[in-house]
Amino acid sequence: MEFIDNNDIENFTKDGAILCRGIFSDWVDKLRIGVDKLIANPSVRERSYIPEDGTAPFFQDLVNWNRISEFNDFIFNSKLGYYASLLMHSKSSRFFHDHVLVKEPGSSIKTPWHQDKPYYCVDGEQSVSFWIALDDISKEGCLECIAGSHLSNVLHKPKTFNGNDLY
């Protein structure tokens, strides 16, 4: 059974985002193990934000697929690349990087509205990001997207997730 069909591809092209429930459900437990390993042994790229009010921290780290075996296994043995190529109308896809974000319930840190593309420092229109929730989340805590915003050619200067300019 395919999780992404032609209607999904059409909606992704038009809206820039789609919801695919359960698409990687067979991988969630393995990815959770990888996240636990990462939190226990973060990379030099780790950037956690500790709220001044004492609420839960916001952990983030990126580019760990080559040292966390669970991430490597997911990237090379799941349908991630296949689904990416479908959504991009491409015969192939290339993996750019992983980015783990862990915001515990009750954290006062708000993720700022942003576009992913300015963070990547690459050109091109064929790009897809997968946001994979490893825990149940409320509607208030989930990712929100602005349908069609990818078509505007307007890029906003990226900020760190505590609101400072990234560069």
What are these regions (language model features)?
Residues 99, 115, 132-136, 147:
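Short, structured patches in soluble enzyme cores that scaffold and shape functional sites
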Residues 138-167:
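Double-stranded beta-helix
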Residues 81, 116, 127-131:
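Hydrophobic, well-ordered secondary-structure segments
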Residues 17-19, 129-133, 145:
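Conserved hydrophobic/aromatic beta-strand scaffold that supports enzyme active sites
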Residues 1-113, 119-121, 158:
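Non-heme Fe(II)-dependent double-stranded beta-helix
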Residues 121-138:
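Short, conserved beta-strand element in jelly-roll/cupin
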